[in-house]
């Protein structure tokens, strides 16, 4: 308001009292603080911030004893709770707070009225008493309200300094009471004059010889009363001394902090020390603007500057006496009429008081009767409702929770199930499920078993391992290794975002760069237990906590902050608080927060139990007298939070509003794990102060409530003291309800806080507080006894919690950490939303559903149908809005346009009832198809086209109006609607343009060749030229349903006779031509063609365009066009004139437009050219831009499979037309901007809570196997008693592996070396290797064990003689195993064996012999049980030999594959192959390397993958050797060609075993073998096992032999030894055994029972057992050659030949990728992207290394980025590999 407009007749007094208003001070300050956060109270906020800063500054300068009295504060509101009338700083706090309150109310009053400064010098005068006069001074120095915000802060500084100084001086006069009792320094005496009181005081002071400084004096006086001041004891003595005063009417005043108005006490130096030490940079040069009346004289202070004014005021406050009568007189004098115009008087004040009422009465009595005196209260505004708060800054915003999701115990996998659980009062307690750990072994209630849990109870979520890996672009292997907490964090984050309707990038607040994640997690069970059993590539990204949040950010492409927090049990709610802080700090605009806990590790159970956290009796018994600890629980929860104003702007549903959030620490607790009531109460106060909320207004608290004695007692105390204090007491209608979700679902630890928050949010939604079920017997006696009197208590039954009309409910959520952290959240109701009722006139609505798998899409459709069946009243408009604009869309899509809910239900049912529906679903392409705009030419326009769009879409309307204004300024009447810009607004990216005839101008404008204004100008002038130069109706145009050549042929006779002439105007399609010419001749042509049954149509146009009729306008048109600038097209232009695609400006000029006007529009040739140049294909989408889809029909005629979309259609609602087009684009793979489509009327739509996404889940769970968490406790105990044998094993050894334990003798000479070693088969590593191969339920040493020992010793001795050897290549030959070595089952026994070796470099060979030894004495047996020879050879010779055989072996493999395809051979899966093996031998998992087998009688091949783990220290791990070689054993013991019912086959050895290169962990190989009976022994079979890597033979087991043994001998030969002594060996039946003392002697060995066996230099496989002596008639002598024999490769007959299997490099690569990712090869389709398959950067590195190592293909990991799909990768491989 301008000053000139103010009421010049109003006389005003502003009175600043020295008393606080009678209102609740805390409430006044809270409301001030609340209003200061609203942008409407900007200056109030500035004033409070400046005042806070000044008080902080002043406190920092105090002496330490005083400084320590002031608690830390961030707002003056924090000081309100301090009892500032007590202590040394009472005067300072009271003075400064009164100044702040009065000036804050003053500023707020003006801002609330939104009025300008109206205090005019001369008309407005200020008055005040005592400290109030300092607040008045701030106004006196101001010329605007903004000035008051700054000068007021300085007044606060002076007030504080004055109070500190006065208190300091006064305590030197009389010390405070030691018991803290407050004594008054002033009394008021009534019905006595000042003079009489002075006389009495003079007598007292003189008579008692009081020092001058401590005398009692008069500090204030008026007609009716006198104030007497002095030290409290002296005042008391004065009243006792004087009979007059003793019997006078007197009262103590609330002045407890010292003396003011004492001229005998203070001097100018005192005043200077207060005023002149002020460090203000604002006030010194400021002038006094308004008169301020002295409280002593009643006249205005004479000061002209700020410094002088404060000096005068300071002098008066410290030394002057207050005379209220003078103040009244001064006020009357000001209010008396100064002129005839003055008609009204006003006193502004802060409520009223006894003094003010006296002044008011006196003024009224003195004023003339024609003066009207009014009062204005400057406090009343503070209680007004100003509507929704408009935050002044992000820091003052309220926050909105807009989405939530959960996985909680008791099957609560969604919010509805969670609420049902709560409403029914269910307890989810159960015992630990077997998939977590085995209670039979890990539970011991006595506590005697180390590392065992003493409680079997918990609360667990359902199916924790189930996860949709494909949806989140994770491979099965990565998913399995990823912590279920992290997986479910992803899932619940998606579901919460879905509920919130968040589409990243839809609005500014949901831009991916402004979204952050905050999750609490306090354990690492999966990483430490389950995944650690087999650490793999994804151990770190799958298990480390930081990756949980990081994976969410990475998947959704959020680039905001990602925090994983651990605050123990409060982690979940602390993460929410951190998210809130980030929102208030402006670091994010949307936050996803939650808590995570999935229990698997018994160690944590044990640790928590031993620390007495856990209940041994069951569930959390919150507030029960028998509470004995908490019960553990799983839990996953996520919430989505925004600032309230953003949520409202985004049209979100708001679940509840966060007013405040805070976390502190119980630093003063008696122990780190003990709760502390003081810290909890301080945190409550912080949250309440932050929000400006009265704790009495809180009506529901969700307790932390663990059910521990200490926790329940402390929390009940803190809650009741703050929220239900003894005084002020809650009214009967202010019941405070309490609840604790842990009594239902247990303590979710890191997820506990988020579970509590989710419950609170549901309480808001359901308006019901669920029953508390934690008290099983009676309430805990440690709970305060007076809770009911305080009107607070648990909701023991389901209790309605209705929202009061026009008000909001307040709730608090607590979560405390065992480490001492306390987190509290304060919530209120969401704003009541009034949905704008629009006129819903859209005829049809687009309903969209999508998924990432066919299964999920079908399930989503079923869910929607079920929802609609249950909610038939659903608004179709809201459903369309929700499914399109408020959903993230995926590659499997369903879309339709419907006009009713019933129609949609019918559509969904018809689709779901189609048995082929799922198979017909196709994902949209990874690359969206190109979109081409086709602009229609003349003849299609009609009245009202696009009118619905014009009416509804502001952008469309604005563009039309802009173009229309351009056209009018150019002198033309109308324009084509701005379709291109509108389609772009809807998110459609244009790839190219084409224009038909006149449409070329629009196409050129869209391509940026000419401007829109130039296009309008040229089209308009062209039309004018046509009208001016061409005769109307003299010519016509004829559309002919035939090609140009066909027309010419049919009209050949007429043309030859020259009876007719025509020109081709347009070649629209190959069968659609438009001709033009003179009207009569065109009519003749029409008749001639119709006579030949050719369809013809005369076009409704007045001219024959693109014919000679246009010649008169061409020169002028070209001249006009030359004035127009032509630019290079921004997108390709498909030219119907040139029948080509134009990419540059060379062909586009004025002449082009001339030719386009005259020459043929060859639309068909242009389309064909675009196809030839690759710009157009069958997937290209065409958008017809024009009033009616003419070009669309032409395109479909040329490309029948093309999608052509109209922008407008005659006689059809234009919004419906656009909707259809958008759905078509959506289903083709584009993602239209549904946001823009719904934006004009978004407020009319509501986001629906539809069923959540239906996941296509698979169980990725790694069970904890065994008892190793228990076993590790025994590592600290002593070892077993030593035997002589075990003692020798404990000595240091130069050679020690898993199988070779100790060197007992070693001799090394120039060319020979001898070595004796000893090993214990009962050693854990050795025993585990033996038990990997069991026969007859006994662990039997496979020959792969002897192979590894041989290679280990061989390489060791060879390097002793030839130390600089790079690689040692060994051929293990003449392996003979005479006796099976069966592991003893006697616990604690030793089972020694001795290996003796002798190497001779002259023969390049080494002989080996294995002996049993006595377990007690270590004495070696007389004869060996196995022998072998190692020959050190050149591997290149092997390579050459095998190269000649490789093609034959590969050929046989291909034949087997083909026969399997034809059903002539058996293809066995891994499970089936090893099931067949169980006829004889049962392999452990690590030995099961064969992935698949093709078996054809005695011939077989196998695909083999070695496990990546070595599981010990080996030369070549036995389980690898067996995996590549035991195919031979499967042939003999699993083929139909063998009599496996009566016999089993074991291998006594082989002629040779050698490997070209070492076997590699995780590598893939192929094995091939063909066994054949030996002619000399019908009970023996032999064959060669070839080992291939890729196309190359890399190893061979030569002449491996198998002997047939009757099954009835199984028990005889494969039973464990009963003692540790060596049994008497069976005498050899053939050859001789090696004597123990003659280790250089070699001898052949007898066959040994065991399925296939192989020996290996770097690797061996197969089942090598021991020789079984058979009955004499069955035995035959076998002589062995020193060189291995290779069995011949048998070439099949032609009839047996088959087509080779696909073993190309591409196929090998695909198989490798499938193996490494855990996917099926069939899933690796050409259009599958590596991102979708879960091939991330880490997997890329693994795959590139595997390609190199296994296939010899050098591929950089970056290739997976350069070739993002399988198809592109395979194309690269075929090209370059």
UniProtKB/Swiss-Prot annotation:
Sequence segments annotated as region (N-terminal acylcarrier protein transacylase domain (SAT)): 27-261
GO MF annotation list: 3-oxoacyl-[acyl-carrier-protein] synthase activity; fatty acid synthase activity; phosphopantetheine binding
Pathway the protein acts in: Secondary metabolite biosynthesis
Cofactor descriptive note: Binds 1 phosphopantetheine covalently.
Alphabetic keyword roster: Acyltransferase, Multifunctional enzyme, Phosphopantetheine, Phosphoprotein, Transferase
Database matches in InterPro entries: Ac_transferase_dom_sf, ACP-like_sf, Acyl_transferase_dom, Acyl_Trfase/lysoPLipase, Ketoacyl_synth_AS, Ketoacyl_synth_C, Ketoacyl_synth_N, PKS_Beta-ketoAc_synthase_dom
SMART domains given in the database record: PKS_AT, PKS_KS, PKS_PP
Active site (UniProt): 569 (for beta-ketoacyl synthase activity), 704 (for beta-ketoacyl synthase activity), 747 (for beta-ketoacyl synthase activity), 1333 (proton acceptor), 1522 (proton donor)
Modified residues (O-(pantetheine 4'-phosphoryl)serine): 1737
Region (Disordered): 1674-1704
Region annotation N-terminal hotdog fold: where it falls in the sequence: 1301-1437
Ranges of Low complexity composition bias in the record: 1677-1688
Stretch list, region C-terminal hotdog fold: 1465-1611
Domain Ketosynthase family 3 (KS3) residues, every copy: 396-829
Region (Malonyl-CoA:ACP transacylase (MAT) domain), start-end ranges: 934-1212
One GO BP annotation of this record: fatty acid biosynthetic process
EC class (word): transferase
EC number(s) reported in the record: 2.3.1.-
The protein's required cofactors: pantetheine 4'-phosphate
Domain (PKS/mFAS DH): residue spans on this chain: 1301-1611
Domain Carrier: 1700-1777
Task performed by this protein: Non-reducing polyketide synthase; part of the gene cluster that mediates the biosynthesis of neosartoricin B, a prenylated anthracenone that probably exhibits T-cell antiproliferative activity, suggestive of a physiological role as an immunosuppressive agent. The non-reducing polyketide synthase nscA probably synthesizes and cyclizes the decaketide backbone. The hydrolase nscB then mediates the product release through hydrolysis followed by spontaneous decarboxylation. The prenyltransferase nscD catalyzes the addition of the dimethylallyl group to the aromatic C5.
Comment, domains: Multidomain protein; including a starter unit:ACP transacylase (SAT) that selects the starter unit; a ketosynthase (KS) that catalyzes repeated decarboxylative condensation to elongate the polyketide backbone; a malonyl-CoA:ACP transacylase (MAT) that selects and transfers the extender unit malonyl-CoA; a product template (PT) domain that controls the immediate cyclization regioselectivity of the reactive polyketide backbone; and an acyl-carrier protein (ACP) that serves as the tether of the growing and completed polyketide via its phosphopantetheinyl arm.
Record protein name field: Non-reducing polyketide synthase nscA
Source organism: Trichophyton equinum (strain ATCC MYA-4606 / CBS 127.97)
């Amino acid at each position: 308001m301008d000053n000139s407009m103010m009421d010049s007749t109003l006389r005003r007094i502003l009175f600043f009292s020295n008393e606080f208003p009678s209102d609740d001070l805390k409430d006044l300050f809270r409301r001030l603080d609340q209003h200061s956060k609203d942008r409407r109270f900007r200056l109030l906020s500035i004033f409070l911030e400046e005042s806070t800063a000044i008080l902080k500054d002043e406190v920092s300068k105090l002496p330490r004893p005083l400084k320590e009295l002031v608690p830390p504060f961030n707002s003056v509101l924090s000081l309100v709770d301090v009892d500032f009338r007590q202590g040394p700083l009472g005067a300072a706090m009271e003075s400064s707070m009164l100044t702040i309150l009065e000036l804050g109310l003053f500023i707020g009053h003006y801002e609330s009225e939104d009025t300008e400064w109206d205090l005019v010098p001369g008309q407005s005068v200020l008055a005040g008493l005592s400290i109030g006069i300092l607040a008045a001074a701030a106004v006196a120095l101001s010329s605007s309200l903004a000035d008051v915000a700054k000068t007021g802060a300085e007044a606060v500084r002076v007030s504080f300094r004055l109070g500190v100084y006065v208190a300091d001086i006064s305590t030197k006069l009389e010390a405070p009471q030691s018991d803290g009792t407050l004594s008054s320094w002033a009394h008021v005496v009534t019905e006595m004059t000042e003079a009489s009181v002075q006389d009495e005081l003079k007598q007292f002071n003189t008579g008692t010889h009081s020092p001058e400084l401590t005398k009692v004096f008069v500090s204030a006086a008026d007609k009716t009363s006198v104030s007497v001041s002095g030290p409290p004891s002296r005042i008391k003595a004065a009243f006792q001394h004087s009979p007059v005063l003793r019997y006078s009417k007197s009262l103590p005043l609330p002045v407890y902090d010292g003396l003011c108005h004492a001229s005998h006490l203070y001097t100018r130096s005192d005043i200077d020390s207060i005023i002149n030490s002020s460090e203000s940079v604002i006030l010194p040069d400021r002038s006094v603007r308004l008169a301020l009346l002295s409280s002593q004289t009643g006249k205005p202070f004479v000061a002209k500057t700020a410094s002088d004014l404060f000096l005068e005021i300071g002098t008066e406050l410290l030394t002057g006496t207050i005379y209220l009568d003078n103040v009244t007189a001064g006020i009357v004098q000001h209010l008396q009429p100064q002129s005839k115009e003055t008609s009204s008087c006003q006193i502004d004040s802060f409520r009223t008081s006894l003094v003010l009422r006296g002044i008011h009465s006196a003024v009224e009595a003195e004023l003339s009767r024609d003066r009207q005196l009014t009062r204005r209260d400057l406090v009343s505004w503070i209680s007004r409702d100003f509507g929704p708060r408009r935050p002044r800054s992000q820091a003052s915003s309220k926050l909105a929770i807009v989405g939530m999701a959960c996985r909680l115990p008791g099957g609560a996998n969604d919010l509805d199930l969670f609420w049902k659980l709560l409403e029914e009062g269910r307890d989810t307690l159960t015992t630990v499920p077997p998939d977590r750990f085995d209670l039979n072994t890990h539970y011991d209630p006595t506590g005697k078993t180390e590392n065992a849990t003493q409680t079997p109870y918990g609360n667990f979520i359902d199916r924790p391992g189930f996860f949709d890996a494909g949806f989140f672009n994770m491979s099965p292997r990565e998913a399995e290794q990823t912590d279920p907490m992290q997986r479910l964090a992803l899932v619940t984050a998606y579901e919460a975002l879905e509920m919130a309707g968040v589409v990243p990038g839809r609005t500014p607040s949901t831009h991916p760069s402004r979204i952050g994640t905050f999750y609490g997690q306090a354990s690492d069970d999966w990483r430490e237990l389950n995944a650690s059993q087999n650490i793999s590539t994804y151990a770190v990204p799958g298990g480390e906590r930081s990756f949980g949040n990081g994976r969410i950010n990475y998947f959704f492409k959020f680039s905001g902050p990602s925090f994983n927090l651990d605050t123990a049990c409060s982690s979940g709610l602390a993460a929410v608080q951190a998210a809130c802080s980030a929102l208030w700090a402006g670091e994010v605009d949307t936050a996803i927060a939650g808590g995570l806990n999935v229990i698997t590790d018994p160690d944590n159970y044990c640790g928590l139990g031993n620390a007495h956290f856990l209940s041994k009796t069951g569930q959390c018994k919150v507030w029960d007298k028998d509470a004995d600890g908490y019960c553990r629980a799983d839990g996953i929860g996520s919430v989505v939070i925004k600032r309230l104003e953003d949520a409202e702007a985004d049209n979100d549903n708001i679940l509840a509003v966060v007013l405040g959030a805070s976390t502190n620490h119980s630093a003063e607790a008696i122990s780190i794990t003990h709760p502390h009531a003081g810290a909890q109460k301080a945190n409550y106060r912080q949250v309440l102060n932050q929000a400006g909320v009265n704790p009495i207004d809180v009506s529901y608290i969700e307790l932390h409530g663990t059910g521990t004695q200490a926790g329940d007692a402390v929390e009940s105390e803190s809650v009741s003291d703050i929220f239900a204090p003894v005084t002020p007491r809650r009214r009967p209608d202010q019941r405070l309800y309490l609840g604790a979700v842990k009594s239902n679902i247990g303590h979710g630890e890191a997820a506990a806080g988020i579970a509590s928050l989710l419950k609170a949010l549901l309480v808001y939604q359901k308006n019901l507080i669920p029953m508390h079920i934690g008290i099983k017997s009676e309430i805990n006696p440690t709970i305060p006894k007076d809770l009911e009197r305080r009107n607070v208590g648990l909701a023991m039954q389901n209790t309605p919690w209705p929202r009061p009309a026009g008000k909001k409910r307040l709730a608090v959520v607590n979560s405390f950490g065992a480490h001492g952290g306390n987190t509290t959240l304060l919530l209120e109701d969401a704003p009541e939303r009034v949905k704008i009722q629009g006129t819903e006139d859209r005829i049809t609505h687009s309903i969209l559903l999508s998924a990432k798998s066919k299964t999920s899409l079908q399930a989503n459709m079923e869910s929607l149908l079920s929802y609609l069946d249950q909610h038939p009243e659903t608004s179709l408009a809201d459903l369309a809005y929700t499914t399109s604009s408020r959903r993230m869309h995926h590659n499997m899509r369903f879309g339709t346009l419907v006009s009713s809910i019933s129609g949609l239900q019918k559509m969904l049912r018809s689709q779901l009832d189609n048995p082929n529906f799922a198979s017909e679903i196709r994902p949209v392409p990874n690359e969206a198809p190109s979109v081409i705009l086709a602009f229609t030419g003349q003849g299609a326009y009609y009245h009202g086209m696009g009118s619905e769009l014009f009416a509804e879409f502001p952008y469309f309307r604005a563009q039309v109006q802009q173009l229309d204004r351009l056209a009018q300024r150019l002198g033309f009447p109308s324009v084509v609607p701005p379709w291109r810009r509108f389609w772009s607004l809807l998110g459609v990216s244009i790839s190219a343009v084409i224009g038909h005839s006149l449409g070329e101008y629009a196409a050129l404008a869209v391509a940026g060749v000419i401007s829109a204004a130039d296009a309008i100008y040229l089209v308009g002038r062209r039309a004018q030229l046509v009208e001016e130069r061409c005769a109307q109706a003299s010519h016509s145009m004829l559309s002919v349903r035939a090609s140009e050549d066909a027309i010419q042929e049919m009209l050949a006779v007429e043309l030859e006779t020259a009876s007719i002439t025509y020109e081709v105007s347009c070649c629209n399609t190959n069968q659609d031509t438009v001709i033009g010419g003179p009207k009569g001749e065109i009519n003749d042509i029409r008749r001639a063609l119709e006579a030949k049954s050719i369809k013809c149509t005369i076009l409704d146009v007045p001219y024959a365009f693109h014919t000679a009729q246009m010649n008169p306008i061409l020169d002028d048109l070209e001249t006009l066009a030359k004035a127009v600038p032509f630019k290079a097209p921004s997108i390709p232009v498909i030219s119907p004139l040139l029948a080509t695609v134009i990419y540059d400006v060379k062909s586009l000029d004025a002449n082009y437009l001339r030719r386009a006007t005259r020459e043929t529009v060859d639309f068909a040739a242009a389309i064909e050219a675009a196809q030839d140049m690759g710009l157009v294909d069958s997937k290209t989408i065409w958008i017809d831009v024009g009033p009616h889809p003419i070009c669309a029909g032409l395109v479909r005629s040329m490309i029948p499979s093309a999608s052509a979309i109209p922008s407008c259609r005659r006689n059809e609602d234009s919004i419906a037309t656009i909707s259809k087009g958008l759905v078509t684009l959506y289903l083709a793979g584009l993602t239209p901007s549904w946001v823009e489509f719904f934006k004009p009327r978004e407020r009319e739509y509501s986001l629906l809570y539809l069923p959540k996404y239906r996941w296509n889940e698979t169980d990725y769970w790694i069970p904890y196997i065994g008892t190793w968490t228990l076993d590790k406790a025994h590592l600290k105990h002593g070892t077993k008693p030593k035997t002589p044998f075990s003692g020798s094993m404990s000595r240091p050894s130069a050679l020690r592996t898993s199988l070779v334990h100790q060197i007992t003798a070693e001799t090394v000479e120039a060319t020979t070396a001898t070595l004796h070693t000893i090993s214990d088969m009962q050693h854990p590593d050795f025993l585990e290797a033996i038990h990997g191969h069991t026969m007859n339920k006994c662990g039997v040493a496979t020959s792969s064990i002897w192979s590894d020992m041989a290679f280990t010793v061989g390489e060791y001795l060879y390097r002793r003689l030839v130390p600089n050897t790079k690689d040692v290549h060994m051929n293990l030959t003449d392996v003979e195993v005479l006796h099976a070595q069966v592991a003893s089952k006697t616990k604690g026994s030793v089972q020694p064996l001795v290996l003796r070796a002798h190497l001779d470099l002259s023969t390049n060979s080494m002989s080996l012999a294995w002996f049993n030894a006595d377990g007690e004495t270590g004495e070696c047996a007389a004869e060996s049980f196995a022998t072998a020879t190692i020959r050190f050879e050149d591997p290149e010779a092997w390579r050459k030999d095998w190269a000649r055989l490789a093609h034959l072996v590969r050929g046989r493999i291909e034949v087997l594959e083909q026969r399997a395809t034809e059903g002539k051979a058996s293809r066995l899966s891994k499970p089936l192959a090893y099931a067949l093996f169980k006829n004889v031998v049962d392999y452990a998992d690590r030995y099961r390397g064969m992935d698949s087998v093709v078996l054809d009688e005695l011939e077989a091949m196998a695909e083999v993958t070695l496990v990546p783990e070595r599981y010990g220290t080996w030369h070549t791990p036995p389980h690898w050797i067996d995996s590549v070689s035991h195919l031979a054993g499967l042939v003999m013991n699993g083929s139909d060609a063998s009599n496996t019912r009566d016999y089993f086959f074991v291998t006594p050895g082989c002629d040779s075993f050698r490997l070209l290169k070492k076997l590699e962990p995780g590598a893939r190989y192929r094995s091939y073998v063909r066994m054949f009976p030996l002619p000399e022994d019908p009970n023996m079979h032999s064959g060669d096992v070839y080992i291939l890597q890729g196309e190359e033979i890399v190893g061979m087991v030569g002449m491996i032999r198998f002997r047939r043994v009757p099954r009835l001998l199984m028990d005889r030969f494969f039973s464990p030894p009963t003692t540790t002594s060596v049994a008497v060996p069976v005498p050899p039946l053939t050859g001789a055994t090696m004597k123990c003392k003659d280790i250089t002697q070699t001898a052949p060995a007898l066959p040994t029972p065991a399925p296939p066996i192989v020996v290996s230099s770097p690797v061996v496989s197969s089942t090598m057992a021991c020789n079984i002596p058979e009955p004499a008639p069955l035995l035959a002598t076998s002589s062995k050659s020193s060189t291995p024999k290779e069995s011949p490769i048998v070439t099949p007959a032609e009839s047996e030949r088959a087509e080779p299997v696909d073993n190309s490099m591409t196929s090998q690569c695909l198989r490798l990728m499938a193996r490494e990712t855990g996917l099926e090869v069939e899933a690796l389709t050409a259009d599958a992207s590596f991102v979708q398959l879960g091939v991330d950067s880490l997997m890329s590195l693994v795959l590139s290394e595997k390609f190199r190592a296994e296939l010899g293909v050098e591929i950089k990991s970056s290739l997976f980025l350069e070739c993002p799909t399988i198809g592109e990768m395979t194309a690269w491989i075929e090209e370059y590999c």
